[in-house]
């Protein structure tokens, strides 16, 4: 009798995705982040639904309802802290996952990559509307500043802003709709994640060497299912440690003050995971230019597959591109630091240089480095012996 997991219509789908999935034998811990993101999404959905049972989306009671959750609901303080800090871990995993994709050339699976960029935008949107819900000072002013950016859209800008606000300022209607969006979007993210996996399983996973691994595949279970469990344990340990010992470490003190439209906080800034994009937005003096740069900072990822010039897929054997990649990582960290700083000298000029370098790396330096490495490879091959020349025809990976 055939195994039920291989014949049952529903179990067969799960089996092909999680049990008998052929995976390259050499994928490293950097390939853990996909499953960690699935764990993050699941944890955020569960904690979020429990919070929604006690939260009230009304400007008169929203702030009090969050305080009520932390004080009066059984383990409400834990659920709230796990949800707030879970968002930070979600973004840590996303940025590491994207970084892995850039380093190892996973972006050459164009459909999977582009759906991943859409997922990143959806998660950023969800986190933004979620940050507004506690209705503290930074929630209110963050919502005001970011939604106001839409007024830069020519001709329809002001109408668009008032349409999103549901009035002439950020008010009750805004909070109600943001709660509706924050509840709905994670389910859309879950659906798009299924698409992301569907396209990934059409091609199979990439690997650190960037080579076709069809000749050397092993089943996902038990090898990588157990390997992923170690990642789960490490992440959950880190998340619970943060949520239990320093739950407000990554938050903003201004958000412990109820929203007041008459008092502007001295420095309006988003959560730490948006600071790099916020720094790019602020580095351009023109409002419309800033909004376009903000969008471009994420959408530039969609251009990466088309700007791949190297004959090799991953950066494993490409030292020049490796240097540029780590320069990009350092640059994003500098932008994150600048995003949290006031708009004054020398932070303005540092932010502008870092923003210019950010786009230069993606649009100019990476393609040039790939082209240069091809030339160096050809030069090396032309001076090699006939036997060595046989291995001088690299493929961009399978």
Curated annotation (Swiss-Prot):
Q: Which cofactor does it need?
A: heme b
UniProt keyword Metal-binding, yes or no:
yes
* Database matches in PROSITE patterns: CYTB_CTER, CYTB_NTER
Q: Where are the transmembrane segments?
A: 33-53, 77-98, 113-133, 178-198, 226-246, 288-308, 320-340, 347-367
Subcellular location(s) of the protein: Mitochondrion inner membrane
Q: InterPro entries from the xrefs?
A: Cyt_b/b6_C, Cyt_b/b6_C_sf, Cyt_b/b6_N, Cytb/b6-like_sf, Cytochrome_b, Cytochrome_b_C_euk/bac, Cytochrome_b_N_euk/bac, Di-haem_cyt_TM
Membrane topology term reads: Multi-pass membrane protein
Function, in words? Component of the ubiquinol-cytochrome c reductase complex (complex III or cytochrome b-c1 complex) that is part of the mitochondrial respiratory chain. The b-c1 complex mediates electron transfer from ubiquinol to cytochrome c. Contributes to the generation of a proton gradient across the mitochondrial membrane that is then used for ATP synthesis.
Sequence similarity: Belongs to the cytochrome b family.
- Supply the name of the protein: Cytochrome b
Q: What is the organism lineage in this UniProt record?
A: Eukaryota, Metazoa, Chordata, Craniata, Vertebrata
């Amino acid at each position: 009798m055939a195994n039920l997991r291989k014949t049952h219509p529903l179990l067969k789908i799960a089996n092909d995705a999680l049990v008998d999935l052929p995976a390259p034998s050499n994928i490293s811990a950097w390939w853990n982040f996909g499953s960690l993101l699935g764990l993050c999404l699941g944890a955020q959905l569960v904690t979020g639904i429990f919070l929604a049972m006690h939260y009230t989306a009304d400007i008169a009671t929203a702030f009090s309802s969050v305080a009520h959750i932390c004080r009066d609901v059984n383990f409400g303080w834990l659920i709230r802290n796990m949800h707030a800090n879970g968002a930070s871990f979600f973004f840590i995993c996303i940025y590491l996952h994207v970084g892995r994709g850039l380093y190892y050339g996973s972006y050459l699976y164009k459909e999977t990559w582009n759906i991943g960029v859409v997922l990143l935008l959806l998660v950023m949107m969800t986190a933004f509307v979620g940050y507004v819900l506690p209705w503290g000072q930074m929630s209110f002013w963050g919502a005001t500043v970011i939604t106001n950016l839409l007024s830069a859209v020519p001709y329809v800008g002001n109408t668009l802003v008032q349409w999103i606000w549901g009035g002439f300022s950020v008010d009750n209607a805004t909070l109600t709709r943001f709660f509706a969006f924050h509840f709905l979007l994670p389910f859309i993210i879950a659906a798009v994640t299924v698409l992301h996996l569907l396209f990934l399983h059409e091609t199979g996973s990439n690997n650190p060497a960037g080579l076709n691994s069809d000749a050397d595949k092993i089943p996902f279970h038990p090898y990588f299912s157990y390997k992923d469990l170690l990642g789960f344990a490490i992440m959950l340990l880190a998340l619970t440690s943060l949520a239990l010992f320093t739950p407000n470490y990554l938050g903003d003190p201004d958000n412990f003050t109820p929203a007041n439209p008459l008092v502007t906080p001295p420095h309006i800034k988003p959560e730490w995971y948006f600071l790099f994009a916020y720094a790019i937005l602020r580095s351009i003096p023109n409002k419309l230019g800033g909004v376009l740069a903000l969008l471009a900072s994420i959408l530039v990822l969609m251009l990466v597959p088309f700007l791949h010039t190297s004959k090799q897929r991953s950066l494993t054997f490409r030292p020049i591109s490796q240097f540029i990649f780590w320069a990009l990582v350092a640059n994003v960290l500098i932008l994150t630091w600048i995003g949290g700083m006031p708009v004054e000298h020398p932070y303005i000029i540092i932010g502008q240089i870092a923003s210019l370098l950010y786009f230069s790396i993606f649009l100019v330096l990476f393609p040039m480095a790939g082209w240069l490495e091809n030339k160096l490879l050809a030069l090396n091959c032309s001076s090699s012996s006939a036997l060595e020349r046989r291995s001088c025809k690299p493929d961009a990976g399978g």
